[in-house]
Regions:
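N-terminal secretory/membrane targeting signals
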Residues: 1-25
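Hydrophobic alpha-helical membrane-interaction elements
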Residues: 28-51
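Active-site and donor-binding regions of nucleotide-sugar-utilizing enzymes
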Residues: 75-230
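Conserved catalytic-core segment of nucleotide-activated headgroup transferases in glycan assembly
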Residues: 84-97, 223-300, 383-386, 397-401, ...
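Short acidic-hydrophobic, aromatic-tinged amphipathic segments that line or gate anion-handling sites
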Residues: 124-130, 310-314, 376-386
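Donor nucleotide-activated moiety binding/catalytic core segment of transferases
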Residues: 129, 294-337
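Catalytic binding pocket for nucleotide-activated donors in carbohydrate/polymer assembly enzymes
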Residues: 214, 334-410
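C-terminal alpha-helical cap of glycosyltransferases
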Residues: 415-432
Length: 432
C-alpha cells in the first residue's frame, strides 16, 4: 500500500505539471463546455488510476508469488449503483471507518465519490458496467451485504441475489413504506433497514399476501438525513438564517418530471398569479427534467423571467434555495417530506389521481403512502380546486413548524444519527 500511495502521488504531481506549465492559447472556452471537459478529464483520470492500481497489484503478485486481496475475509459489503446514492452511503461508510470495521464497497459508477476515499478499512472497487460487473457483485461472499438498490434477484433486474451472501439488507432512501416500492422488488431481501417502526405493517401485509419468508425488520431511520441535518446545522450556525420577516415571502416550486409534474396537470398560470401577488418564486425543476424535457423547462423560464420575483435554480445542491424559501409547492414528489422534516417548513401539495400504482405494492395495500400524510406537513389540493391555489398558498404559510416536527418524530426514528444505529446493528451481527 505504501508503494501504491507513492505511485499515486507521482501520477497526480505529473498531471499537475502538465496542466500548470502550458503556453497561452488565446482561445475562448464557454463555462458549460469547460465544465464538461473538466468532468471528462476527472472521469478519465479516475479510470486510469484504478486501472493502474490493478496493474500494480498484479505485478506485485507476480514478483512476490502472493495474491494480494483485501476482500478475502471481510464480513460486510456495500453495493452502490453510483454517485446519485452517495448521500445515503456516505454516513454509513464514515461510521464503519470510525468504528474500524473493514468492508468492501463495489460500485458500477466510475464517478462514485467513494472511489476517492483511501482508507485501510475501506476496500472500494469500480467493477465496471454490464453483465460482467453484475457477475462480480454476484460473486460476493460477505455474510452481510448493504444496499439501497431494490430489485436484486428479480427477473427484470440484471443482478441476481449473491448466493454466498447470508443477509441481503435493503436500506431505505426515502420516507415511505413498502406501498411506494415496485411489486416484488424486496422479495429476495433478508433484512429491511426501515425509516421507522410503522413501516413493518406494510411489509408484513405483502409477505402474507405473497406467502414470503418474513424479513428481519430493523427501524434505523434515514442515513442521508444524517448528512442533510449536518449540512443544515452548519448553514444555520454560519448565517443564523437571517430572513427578513418584513420582506416578501419566497416559494420554492419543486415539481416532479414528466406527466407526474404538477405543472403538467395544473398548468403554469398559477405562477403568474402568485408572482403578481408580490411573492417570490424559485423554480427548481427535477434533475430528470433538465435531461429529458429541457424545452418545457425553458418555456417556463421564458414565460416568467421578466418578473422581478422569479428565479431559476439548477444547482445540484438544493440547500440554498430550501433555506431561502418560506414554503414549497410540489406534487407527489418525495422531496416534500425532506423539505418539511429538515427545514420544518410547510408544503402545498398539488395532488392528482394516479393511474400508475398497478406496478407498485400499493395495489395490494390499497393506498399509496404520502397522499393523506401530505396534509400533516401543509395543505393538499386537488385539480378540481386549482382556482384555490393562491388562497392555499396563504393558508400554507400559516402552517406551524411545530406540527411538522411532531409528525417527523412519529415517522422518522434516529433523526440525524441513523448511520450509528445501522453500524451498531452490523457490529452485533458480525461479532463472534
Amino acid at each position: 500500500m505504501k508503494y501504491l500511495n507513492i505511485f499515486k502521488s507521482k501520477v497526480i504531481f505529473s498531471s499537475f505539471l502538465i496542466f500548470a506549465f502550458t503556453k497561452d492559447a488565446y482561445a475562448y472556452l464557454d463555462p458549460g463546455s469547460g465544465n464538461a471537459i473538466i468532468c471528462l478529464i476527472l472521469s478519465l483520470a479516475g479510470a486510469v488510476l484504478y486501472y493502474l492500481k490493478s496493474v500494480f497489484y498484479r505485478i506485485i503478485s507476480i514478483v512476490t508469488g502472493k495474491k494480494i486481496s483485501h476482500e478475502k475475509n471481510e464480513k460486510v459489503s456495500i453495493f452502490s449503483e453510483g454517485k446519485n446514492y452517495w448521500l445515503t452511503y456516505k454516513p454509513i461508510v464514515e461510521e464503519l471507518i470510525a468504528c474500524k470495521i473493514s468492508f468492501i464497497y463495489y460500485t458500477i459508477d466510475i464517478d462514485d465519490p467513494a472511489l476517492l476515499i483511501d482508507n485501510e478499512y475501506m476496500h472500494s472497487r469500480y467493477v465496471g458496467t454490464g453483465d460482467r460487473a453484475f457477475a462480480k457483485v454476484g460473486s460476493l461472499k460477505t455474510p452481510i451485504m448493504i444496499t439501497t438498490t431494490p430489485n436484486i434477484g428479480c427477473p427484470t433486474y440484471p443482478l441476481r441475489r449473491p448466493g454466498k451472501v447470508k443477509k441481503l439488507c435493503h436500506v431505505w432512501h426515502s420516507i415511505c413504506d413498502s406501498s411506494c416500492y415496485h411489486l416484488g422488488c424486496l422479495d429476495h431481501y433478508d433484512v429491511a433497514l426501515t425509516v421507522g417502526t410503522w413501516v413493518e405493517d406494510s411489509l408484513r401485509q405483502v409477505e402474507r399476501i405473497r406467502k414470503l419468508t418474513p424479513k428481519t425488520v430493523v427501524p434505523v431511520g434515514l442515513p442521508y438525513f444524517d448528512e442533510l441535518k449536518k449540512n443544515y446545522d452548519l448553514r444555520i450556525s454560519d448565517s443564523a438564517q437571517k430572513n427578513d420577516k418584513n420582506s416578501a415571502k419566497t416559494i420554492l416550486l419543486a415539481p416532479s418530471w414528466g406527466t407526474k409534474s404538477c405543472l403538467r396537470v395544473y398548468g403554469t398560470d398559477f405562477i403568474k398569479e402568485v408572482l403578481e401577488e408580490g411573492y417570490n418564486i424559485i423554480y427548481r425543476p427535477h434533475p430528470q427534467s433538465l435531461k429529458v424535457e429541457m424545452d418545457f423547462v425553458n418555456n417556463v423560464i421564458s414565460d416568467f423571467k421578466e418578473y422581478k420575483g422569479f428565479s431559476f435554480d439548477h444547482d445540484p445542491d438544493a440547500t440554498e434555495s430550501m433555506m431561502k424559501s418560506d414554503m414549497m409547492i410540489s406534487d407527489k414528489s418525495g422531496v416534500r417530506f425532506d423539505y418539511a422534516f429538515i427545514y420544518e417548513k410547510p408544503v402545498l401539495s398539488l395532488d392528482f389521481s394516479t393511474d400508475f400504482i398497478d406496478a407498485y405494492e400499493a395495489i395490494l395495500l390499497g393506498r399509496l403512502w404520502g397522499d393523506t400524510e401530505s396534509e400533516l406537513i401543509g395543505i393538499r389540493l386537488q385539480p378540481e380546486n386549482r382556482n384555490m391555489i393562491m388562497e392555499s398558498v396563504k393558508k400554507t404559510l400559516q402552517y406551524s413548524g411545530k406540527e411538522i416536527k411532531n409528525f417527523r418524530e412519529k415517522v422518522l426514528c434516529n433523526y440525524g444519527c441513523s448511520s450509528e444505529h445501522i453500524v451498531d446493528w452490523i457490529k452485533n451481527e458480525i461479532q463472534p
